[in-house]
Structures are given as structure tokens and as C-alpha cells.
Design a protein with these regions (language model features):
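Active-site catalytic microenvironments in core metabolic enzymes, especially phosphate/sugar-handling
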Residues: 2-260
Length: 260
């Protein structure tokens, strides 16, 4: 779609349609609703993107004059009780009292080949995907964009910390040059076995659980937990900037830091 000249506003239905056209949420079996989660005002002048629909992000979006918020982690998830109390009540109160729309895309924003978290993390890390793996093809696998190899797991660990600006948890596999790297952002530690089966020499994700350390050592495949938030900072602003340019509205990414 050709970007529209910048105008003062669009309507909520056009914003939702633009996001859905890119994300194709109907293709995914997800843990919560994708698309519009909370309805606010009909006219949209400013879109704020962020990782999680936390109270801090909502308050920052209010201060920024947002009409809509676009996130990766929304408010509603499978298995919730459905009771609106406490922290959930407060987040909803802020959104509804300020008539702010909330849009959320979870797995669709992980999987998108250009705007998604995995694709955008690859851009930041200098990686290039040559294939997919795992349930719903959410995992990416490939190597360095420049065609070189990482000298070993220590070098890859240092480069991850340098690119993401935070320490990583690194479990050493074989001490060998690393050519084939797999990655899946966020809490995708359960994809490690699929990455091993796909032929990865190293796996990058956000979180680690107890079994992955043993698998890394026993299978000789290095495992890197780089932070759930840190690996998923890039999809929401990429999608937000993309649809804002299409619709001629303003966009701002607000990063609420999270050490997890």
C-alpha cells in the first residue's frame, strides 16, 4: 500500500484494518484475542506502541496524547477468571476514562516475516533467516547476514550483550565456530528441542527454564536467554510506524523498561 500524505487523523476501523491486513491474526491459534481489545474514541490522531499494556505504558501514552495504543502483550489471556478487579480494573479504568483504544497482536507479531519480533531481532543482531521451525513456524533459523561464522559461543554471547545492552544467560554447548543459529523471541525456551532438531548450533530466546541447561550441555547446542522484554522490543514499533505511515497519523514508541 502506498503511504498516504500526512493528515491529522484516521478512524479506528481503518487503523484496525491496516493492522489486521499485516498481522493476519486468523492464521494463528493464540493465547488471547488479537486485534482491538478495548474500544476508545473513533478518531485516531496519535498511535503509541509499546511491548506490554502495563499501567506505566498506559499512563505514559495518556501523557503523550495517544488515541490508540498498540502492544504485543495485551490485557486478556486464555485462562483468566474474567473478574475485573485490582490491577486489571485500574488499567481498564485508565483506558476507558481517556477513551484510548487498545490493540494487541501476540503470535502474529512474533511471526511476521518483516515487521515481527523475530524478524526485527534478526535485524538488530545482524542475522538472516533461511527457514522456520517449531509449532506454527514461529521459530527462525539461519546465520549471520554477512555470511561469516561466530568464532564460538563466548563471542556470540558478547555480541548479544553488546547489541541488546544487557547481560544474557549463556549455556555453553560445543566449543566450536557457530554458523547455524536459531531464534524465537520472548518465552520460547520450549522451542529449544525443535531448534536442535532443525540443526541449530545455538538458540537465542528471551527466557530459560531448568531443563534447557541440561539439554544444551548434553546436545552440544549453546542456549542464550536474552530477556523476554529485550527480545520483543522491536515488533510493536515496527508495526506501529508502518501503519502510521500508511494512514498519515503520528506514531511514538514508548519503551517501559523491564529486566525480565
Amino acid at each position: 500500500m502506498t503511504p498516504m500524505p500526512e493528515t491529522s487523523q484516521t478512524d479506528r476501523s481503518a487503523l484496525l484494518a491496516a493492522c489486521n491486513a499485516e498481522m493476519q491474526p486468523e492464521r494463528f491459534k493464540d493465547y488471547g484475542p488479537n486485534g482491538l481489545q478495548v474500544e476508545g474514541r473513533a478518531q485516531i490522531r496519535k498511535l503509541v506502541s509499546g511491548v506490554t499494556a502495563s499501567r506505566a505504558l498506559i499512563e505514559a501514552a495518556i501523557d503523550a496524547g495517544a488515541d490508540a495504543i498498540l502492544v504485543h502483550h495485551g490485557l486478556f489471556w486464555r485462562g483468566q477468571s474474567g473478574v475485573i478487579t485490582g490491577w486489571l480494573k485500574e488499567r481498564l479504568r485508565l483506558l476507558l476514562s481517556h477513551e484510548i483504544n487498545l490493540l494487541a497482536y501476540h503470535l502474529p507479531l512474533d511471526a511476521h516475516p518483516v515487521l515481527g519480533n523475530n524478524a526485527q531481532l534478526a535485524r538488530v543482531l545482524g542475522l538472516q533467516a533461511t527457514g522456520r521451525f517449531g509449532e506454527q513456524d514461529l521459530g527462525f533459523i539461519g546465520g549471520r547476514l554477512d555470511g561469516e561464522t561466530f568464532a564460538d559461543a563466548d563471542v556470540l554471547s558478547w555480541q548479544l550483550e553488546h547489541a541488546l545492552g544487557r547481560p544474557v544467560v549463556a549455556i555453553q554447548g560445543k566449543r566450536e565456530p557457530i554458523e547455524r543459529v536459531a531464534w524465537c523471541t520472548g518465552g520460547a525456551q520450549s522451542y529449544f528441542e525443535a531448534a536442535i532438531a532443525a540443526g541449530a548450533q545455538a538458540f537465542i530466546t528471551g527466557e530459560i527454564s531448568e531443563p534447557q541447561a541440561h539439554l544444551a550441555r548434553e546436545c552440544g547446542v549453546s542456549f542464550f536467554a536474552c530477556g523476554h522484554h529485550a527480545t520483543e522490543r522491536y515488533g510493536a514499533p515496527a508495526l506501529g510506524a508502518h501503519v502510521a505511515a500508511q494512514l498519515g497519523i503520528s506514531h511514538q514508541f514508548i519503551d517501559i523498561d523491564n529486566p525480565a
